[in-house]
Amino acid sequence: MNDIAAGTEQRSALPPELRRVHMVGIGGAGMSGIARILLSRGGEVSGSDAKESRGVLALRARGAQVRIGHDAGALDLLPGGPTAVVTTYAAIPKTNPELVEAQRRDIPVLLRPAVLASLMRGHRTLLVSGTHGKTSTTSMLIVALQHCGFDPSFAVGGELNEAGTNAHHGTGEIFVAEADESDGSLLQYDPDVAVVTNIESDHLDFFGSDAAYTQVFDDFADRLAAGGLLVVCLDDPGSRALAERVGPRLAERGVRVLGYGSGELADAPVPVGVRLHSWEPRDVGGVAQFQLGDEPAPRTLRLSVPGRHMALNALAALLAARAAGADLDEIIQGLEGFGGVHRRFQFVGRENGVRVFDDYAHHPTEVRAVLGAAAALVEQEARDGARSRQGRVIVVFQPHLYSRTATFATEFGAALSLADEVVVLDVYGAREKAMPGVNGALVAQAVTAPVHYQPDMSRVGRQVAGLALPGDVVITMGAGDVTMLGSQILDGLRARPQHGR
């Protein structure tokens, strides 16, 4: 066996506790990715989830034993029972009957981040963190590396349009993943390259204070080993401040820090790896002019995904891919072929001159970025004469979590006001219990644009179809089941009389 084959076999080997695993909540974005990698590496996997889903069906097709509903008997889906039970920090209550049964049987209960950290061992790890943009940046990095001939393992929070999956066990030495800060789990990982897209107040239900939330990124940067690289966005005050705080001590340990951003950046606290000169929207993508810190002239990058924030995400991915040894021209070609991520400004369809998109945005800054990209799109089309009238942006927003809605209701209102017309649904509570007085109306009251509070989702399709005109862009937005409304809106548009373009 040659060295390459031996290395691949060593990276594929599973530790004893991960050879037969039961996963509680197996259909979730993070958990299903872990399950896919375990199955690819020869593990046996069982699991449970509250409902059937596309992810559950895909895992069954790959050999996982999955039960819908939660009960103690699910731990017997694998002959001999599991060697470990895997769960997440927040989504699964400790009273879950499968977790109770695992404790009764003395079966180790592992948290998802610890399992992902174990799967990364023996790899060169490229991790993307930040309050916003993790999934898109991670996905761009994966697609760029694949185009360059690498076969990285990866685990990402959304489904790559190119790969049709959110996780993969590759033959190469590189492992690319999101480092989720929401519950502090990014401190389980030891990155060789770390990207921080931005740092802004979030997840205060877990951290309790802005200071504690910010500190987790400092601690994450400190986990970089000698010879590693930290990539930070200099346009974002939070990540720029991170570079100022940790840059000197990382340099003492032989860790480089590179920044990316736009503008002059003359007072940047760290070397500028790449600078965005300009962004020009085009249809559902755009053209970026950028310049590397070690090159004398600008280059052009044509993206198929919209928004200036996506151009910055692409430049972060470019720096990380270069650090992995990929060829620059090939990286650019790979980024230009990036087709997006499931539920990230995803095109759903077009009817009667109205385009419908879907996006996962569930924080005010994310909402602002997506609506800004949509506004730039319709404005550019009007300048180009592509439409007989300038289209409007109509957003259907579903707040996610009662705690987040209570904290950010005013900020959500301000961000949503960037749209021309707003429909606000009630809160998608997910794991949380309802809070008195916290609902969609609380957000709607803070919107200054024309706004409609609609607590009945069954009426949204027809309502939005009645609001939209040819040339308009409709975006369903949120981390809950608002994603199901796109097809209903298209049905409503299809049923009404035909208009001009």
Swiss-Prot record:
Catalytic activity of the protein: UDP-N-acetyl-alpha-D-muramate + L-alanine + ATP = UDP-N-acetyl-alpha-D-muramoyl-L-alanine + ADP + phosphate + H(+)
Single GO biological process annotation from the record: peptidoglycan biosynthetic process
Gene3D superfamilies: Mur ligase, C-terminal domain, Mur-like, catalytic domain, NAD(P)-binding Rossmann-like Domain
Alphabetical list of Pfam families matching this protein: Mur_ligase, Mur_ligase_C, Mur_ligase_M
Keyword Lyase: no
Pathway recorded for this protein: Cell wall biogenesis; peptidoglycan biosynthesis
Compartment(s): Cytoplasm
Binding positions for ATP per the UniProt entry: G130, T131, H132, G133, K134, T135, S136
Chief place where the protein resides: cytoplasm
SUPFAM superfamilies the record matches: MurCD N-terminal domain, MurD-like peptide ligases, catalytic domain, MurD-like peptide ligases, peptide-binding domain
Keywords of the record: ATP-binding, Cell cycle, Cell division, Cell shape, Cell wall biogenesis/degradation, Cytoplasm, Ligase, Nucleotide-binding, Peptidoglycan synthesis
GO molecular function: ATP binding; UDP-N-acetylmuramate-L-alanine ligase activity
EC category name: ligase
Signal peptide span: none
UniProt-listed Enzyme Commission number(s): 6.3.2.8
Cross-referenced PANTHER family: UDP-N-ACETYLMURAMATE--L-ALANINE LIGASE, UDP-N-ACETYLMURAMATE--L-ALANINE LIGASE-RELATED
NCBIfam families named in the record: murC
Role played: Cell wall formation.
Recorded family membership: Belongs to the MurCDEF family.
Name of this protein: UDP-N-acetylmuramate--L-alanine ligase
Taxonomy of the source species: Bacteria, Bacillati, Actinomycetota, Actinomycetes, Mycobacteriales
Name of the gene encoding the protein in the UniProt record: murC
